């Protein structure tokens, strides 16, 4: 496997793996660690953002053009690499500009996960509660007893047991929400079950989910962009730098410079580590690399091995349809954003483009 190497980091990895080798809930290999180096944060309300150069970082600039060419060939619109919070690379392709907005697609699930965590921190909900506590009885076609067994955590972990074989798996109308499995016994990437989290937050806080998310995250870290309803989906649209701001927030475990956005570190750890034993490569709506097995959207199959063999083991990611990418590499204080068109597979989350992209990134950044 290709990965970043540094003598001190190698020593840390040896110590970590000597103490833990399972993929169960609470596995902390992927937890972003703000202590690995000082992070820079761009000012809120300003376009100012400090930069650093590949040369200053000792990266292989002879591999930079190959990375650019791949991104251009695969329909990329915006691409940013942050190292220690500073911009190393910021590229826009075709007619797309720094001011243009783009859908995050399912990479926006990471925003929802943090919003739920903030609502819990503020005492509006508990993810261990039944969803019925916030949605009321009869939100689905299940019996009251079956509804009572589905918790908010099950929605965060894709384990509600709702029937994903319905005609429209995005539909969250009552008639579309049928029983298939006991909650917590089966993992499937079911978008309707995820989107219901918006209703849960709205009911729990008394504030519309979109507004609550803006107030608690977007506005406080200088993002722009909006949640837009498209069919049954609530999709977040923003410019590329706004996605990078959110990635930087997550790289620092929910703290923006000296401002706590999500101060509940227990929730943050649960969000960014294995959340259940059915798909060790999934946290609370975040994808996790370096695990022994994974499942993929649209498939019931369990695949042996990690998500992206060429990516760092501690990578965590927000992944959206048509290859929207938010990558965090905590061990290197590295954050990467890719927004654009489908790179060839039309996948809802992970795709072969991830590994191809990491081959070029490894050559540029260093293995």
Q: Where are each of the predicted segments found?
A:
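Bacterial N-terminal signal peptides that target proteins for export
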Residues: 1-8
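Bacterial N-terminal signal peptides
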Residues: 8-16
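N-terminal leader/targeting segments and the immediately adjacent pre-domain N-terminus
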Residues: 19-97, 102, 120-125, 289, ...
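Active-site SXXK
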Residues: 85, 102-128, 155, 196-201, ...
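Catalytic-site signature segments of enzymes, centered on catalytic residues
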Residues: 98-99, 161-238
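Active-site helix/loop module of the DD-peptidase/beta-lactamase fold
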Residues: 122-158, 207-239
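Penicillin-binding protein/beta-lactamase superfamily catalytic region
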Residues: 222-330, 343-351
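Short, well-ordered beta-strand elements
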Residues: 332-341
């Amino acid at each position: 496997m290709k990965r970043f190497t540094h003598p001190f980091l190698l020593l840390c990895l040896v110590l970590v793996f000597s103490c833990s080798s399972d993929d169960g809930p609470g596995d902390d290999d992927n937890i972003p660690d703000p202590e690995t180096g000082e992070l820079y944060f761009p000012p809120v309300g300003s376009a100012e953002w400090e930069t650093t150069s590949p040369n200053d970082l000792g990266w292989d600039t002879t591999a930079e053009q190959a990375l650019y060419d791949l991104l251009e060939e695969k329909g990329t619109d915006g691409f940013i690499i942050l190292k220690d919070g500073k911009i190393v690379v910021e590229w826009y392709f075709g007619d797309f500009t720094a001011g243009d907005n783009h859908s995050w697609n399912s990479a926006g699930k990471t925003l929802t996960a943090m919003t739920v965590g903030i609502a819990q921190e503020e005492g509006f909900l508990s993810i261990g509660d039944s969803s019925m506590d916030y949605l009321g009885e009869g939100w689905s076609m299940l019996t009251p007893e079956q509804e009572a067994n589905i918790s908010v955590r099950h929605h965060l972990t894709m384990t509600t047991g709702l029937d994903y074989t319905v005609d429209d798996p995005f539909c969250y109308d009552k008639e579309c929400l049928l029983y298939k499995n006991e909650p917590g016994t089966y993992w499937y990437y079911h978008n309707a079950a995820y989107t219901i989290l918006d209703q849960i937050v709205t009911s729990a806080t008394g504030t519309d989910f979109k507004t609550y998310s803006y107030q608690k995250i977007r506005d406080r870290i200088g993002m722009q962009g909006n949640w837009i309803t498209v069919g049954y989906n609530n999709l977040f649209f923003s410019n590329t730098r706004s996605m990078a701001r959110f990635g930087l927030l997550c790289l620092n475990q929910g703290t923006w410079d000296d401002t706590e956005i999500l101060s509940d570190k227990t929730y943050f750890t649960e969000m960014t580590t294995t959340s259940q034993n059915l798909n060790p490569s999934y946290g609370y709506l975040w994808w996790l690399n370096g695990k022994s097995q994974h499942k993929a959207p649209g498939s019931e199959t369990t695949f042996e091995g990690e998500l992206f063999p060429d990516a760092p083991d501690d990578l965590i990611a927000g992944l959206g349809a048509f290859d929207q990418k938010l990558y965090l590499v905590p061990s290197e204080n590295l954050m990467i954003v890719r927004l654009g068109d489908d790179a060839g597979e039309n996948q809802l989350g992970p795709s072969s483009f991830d590994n191809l992209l990491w081959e070029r990134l490894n050559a540029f950044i260093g293995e």
